[in-house]
A protein has these predicted regions:
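GST-like domain detector, emphasizing the conserved glutathione-binding G-site
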Residues: 1-118
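Single conserved hydrophobic/aromatic residue that forms the stacking wall/gate
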Residues: 121-130
């Protein structure tokens, strides 16, 4: 059985979706980020950067952190969505999502929904004089 340590974030959702698609038995353990549960010593043992998601595969007692690494692990383990002959292309797009697309969307959401500030009143000369 796979245990998924997660929270309600896009990276956490990716793993839940994959686990559903590959039809693996899994248990969800919610990590309360606002209460700092990700900083507890027992969590740091499985997630050295104190981030979610993380899985523990109780069949072999291995833990995997980082959403991309987890997706690759589950793809290999299930023999689904990660065929050997397409892994180069899959890995390229996965890394692009993790390193470029995902963070940019995250920044957009952070500033658009949680810290909205209008900059429309600033003109180019005002911006350049700062």
């Amino acid at each position: 059985m796979i245990e998924l340590f997660t929270a309600d974030t896009p990276n956490g959702w990716k793993i839940s979706i994959m686990l559903e698609e590959i039809n693996f038995d899994y248990k969800i353990s919610k990590v309360n980020l606002s209460e700092g549960e990700q900083h507890k010593p027992e969590f740091k043992k499985i997630s050295p950067f104190n981030k979610i998601p993380v899985i523990t595969d109780h069949e072999n007692n291995k833990s995997v952190f980082e959403s991309g690494a987890i997706l690759m692990y589950l793809g290999e383990k299930s023999n689904m969505f990660y065929p050997e002959d397409n892994r180069l292309e899959i890995n390229q797009w996965l890394m692009a999502q993790m390193g470029l697309i995902g963070p940019m969307i995250g920044q957009h959401h952070q500033f658009h929904y949680y810290h909205p500030v209008s900059y429309t009143h600033l003109t180019l000369p005002t911006i350049c004089s700062v």
